[in-house]
Amino acid sequence: MRKAIFPGTFDPFTIGHYSVVERALTFMDEIIIGIGINENKNTYFPIEKREEMIRNLYKDNPRIKVMSYDCLTIDFAQQVEAQFIVRGIRTVKDFEYEETIADINRKLAGIETILLFTEPELTCVSSTIVRELLTYNKDISQFIPEGMEIN
């Protein structure tokens, strides 16, 4: 069984994240969306709310699980017995960073990282932008997956 984690803060989960998960499902049997807890990061939504939003989005898909974790991503991958880490790439800067982390993860644990490039129309979408729009009470519906409720 091919199992992957898709790690991130997901504050909030965007259509870009959704696209990565949907594309990864074409070659993975199970994907665990791992919501990393970083005490040094100020988040817009509490961890419980992020878990709830994503879990509700995938409630009818038994191949998707949602979990939070507060350790190194590679340790989380080993804990859940994932063979792969899936990451989304929007820019060259993202690629350079993820390539380095992928090399370290392979050396430390033998876990491969699969990099999926964002579709061109989604490269401008980020959780940071969505949070900024939320701060100013703007409509974010075009930037989050259909059916995901943010309130």
From Swiss-Prot:
It is found in: Cytoplasm. Pathway: Cofactor biosynthesis; coenzyme A biosynthesis; CoA from (R)-pantothenate: step 4/5. It holds the Pfam family CTP_transf_like. GO terms for biological process: coenzyme A biosynthetic process. One of its GO terms (molecular function) is pantetheine-phosphate adenylyltransferase activity. GO terms for cellular component: cytoplasm. ATP binds at residues 9-10, 17, 88-90, 98, 122-128. Substrate binds at residues 9, 41, 73, 87. It comes from the Bacteria. Its cofactor is Mg(2+). Its EC number is 2.7.7.3. Its main location: cytoplasm. The record marks 17 as: Transition state stabilizer. It catalyses: (R)-4'-phosphopantetheine + ATP + H(+) = 3'-dephospho-CoA + diphosphate. Signal peptide: none annotated. Homohexamer. Reversibly transfers an adenylyl group from ATP to 4'-phosphopantetheine, yielding dephospho-CoA (dPCoA) and pyrophosphate. HAMAP family: PPAT_bact. This is Phosphopantetheine adenylyltransferase.
